[in-house]
Design a protein with these regions (language model features):
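Substrate-binding cleft of secreted/luminal carbohydrate-active enzymes
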Residues: 261-340
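An active-site-proximal structural segment forming one wall of the substrate-binding cleft
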Residues: 76-80, 84-94, 99, 104-130, ...
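Acidic/histidine-rich helix-loop elements
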Residues: 56-57, 61-79, 140-141, 240-259, ...
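Active-site region of glycoside hydrolase catalytic domains
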Residues: 147-248, 253-286, 312-313, 318
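Bacterial N-terminal signal peptides
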Residues: 8-15
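N-terminal carbohydrate-binding accessory modules
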Residues: 22-94
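Acidic-and-aromatic substrate-binding clefts and catalytic sites of carbohydrate-active enzymes
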Residues: 70-79, 100-109, 133-144, 173-177, ...
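Positively charged n-region of N-terminal signal peptides that target proteins for export
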Residues: 1-4
């Protein structure tokens, strides 16, 4: 709702500006320039009825959250509409719905509902596929399985709001890391297949080495991208570290900050060179799954620098992940994590 109200105000102001730009007096302005969008027009924008350009889509993504609503057993069992409403109320603009299961009716029973709930409430849904078999063994058989998965998903959602986008692979890891040519082949074949049913939907590809921005330059733009392509990259997806030089963060020294800004600059340079916008699909304020030895105060400092750096670069991001901040069983925000959450989503 708040998005629709702001949209009406902006368009109304733009109409006045256009009228006065050529010296038109107030009395000469037609009443139509003062009328906001009709309900139908508002709905078309708010619900993504028409295709959305990649740069416009990037500007809409804002700050998001990685969720396992369709990935884990608990995520599926505890999913509910109130969680989506709570996320929107808290300022979360998009969710990255991570999926590892087969594209079948069992998946669609929950995924359909989640996508519709997000669109109706005002959160952008991004479907992201894990494709573990292909990452572990990127042979032809496993490649065909990934293409087939996306064929089914693309057919299922071909008439869905253009706010829905397809994130083709959740970070290249394992054996796939050493075969960038196979990664590019995968993207070429998936995009070709998806474009048969979704010619103007946003498709998102990511570089190797766990979506490292430094390897964006290795990506080959799929021949059927059709002007509706973005790239995902990420860093600190499992949080910072007090001893790993690649993601070191202790007190926020200049060198530690430079590790962050260098990656952002790689992305900005690639965006400028290719005219393809990017998005950070995951970063974590603490090393929750590997020691969890950052205090709340330390997490706040890290989160503040990370958030401000990405916001200043105008690169949207998703935080990893929902269960660290939100109790899905009680539908309550986790009290002791609120200082970190509020630092990011303020």
């Amino acid at each position: 709702m708040k998005r629709k109200i702001v949209l009406c105000i902006i368009i109304t102001l733009m109409s006045f500006h256009a009228a006065f730009a050529d010296g038109t007096e107030l009395s000469q302005v037609t009443i139509s320039s003062q009328i906001p969008l009709s309900t139908k027009e508002q709905n078309e924008v708010a619900y993504g009825v028409n295709p959305i350009s990649p740069w416009e889509y990037q500007s809409k993504l804002g700050k998001g959250m990685d969720v396992d609503w369709s990935k884990t057993k608990k995520g599926k069992e505890n999913y509910n509409l109130k969680a989506v409403q709570d996320f929107e109320d808290a300022g979360i603009d998009h969710v990255r719905i991570r999926i590892k299961d087969k594209a079948d009716n069992d998946l669609f029973m929950t995924l359909d509902e989640q996508i519709d709930d997000c669109i109706n409430i005002g959160i952008i849904p991004i479907i992201a596929y894990q494709a573990d078999e292909f990452k572990n063994n990127p042979n032809e058989e496993n490649l065909q399985k990934v293409v087939a998965w996306w064929r089914v998903v693309a057919e299922r959602y071909k008439d869905k709001s253009y706010l829905l986008s397809f994130d083709l692979l959740i970070e290249a890891t394992d054996a796939l890391n050493k075969q960038p040519e196979k990664l590019n082949e995968l993207y070429e074949r998936i995009v070709t297949e998806v474009r048969k049913t979704n010619p103007q939907r946003i498709i998102i590809i990511s570089p190797r080495l766990r979506s490292d921005a430094q390897y964006l330059s290795e990506l080959k733009i799929p021949s059927q991208a059709n002007g509706y392509l973005m790239a995902e990259w990420h860093f600190y997806a499992a949080g910072p570290s007090k001893d790993n030089d690649r993601k070191l963060w202790t007190i926020g020294t200049e060198n530690e900050k430079k590790l962050i800004t260098d990656k952002i600059n790689y992305a900005l340079e690639w965006q400028k060179k290719t005219n393809i916008p990017t998005w950070v699909g995951a970063w974590m304020p603490g090393n929750y799954n590997d020691g969890d030895d950052y205090s709340i105060e330390e997490q706040v400092v890290f989160a503040e620098f990370m958030t401000s750096s990405l916001v200043n670069a105008q690169i949207p991001f998703a935080v990893n992940s929902d269960t660290k901040f939100y109790d899905r069983e009680t539908n309550n925000w986790i009290d002791n994590m609120l200082p970190v959450f509020n630092t990011i989503f303020k």
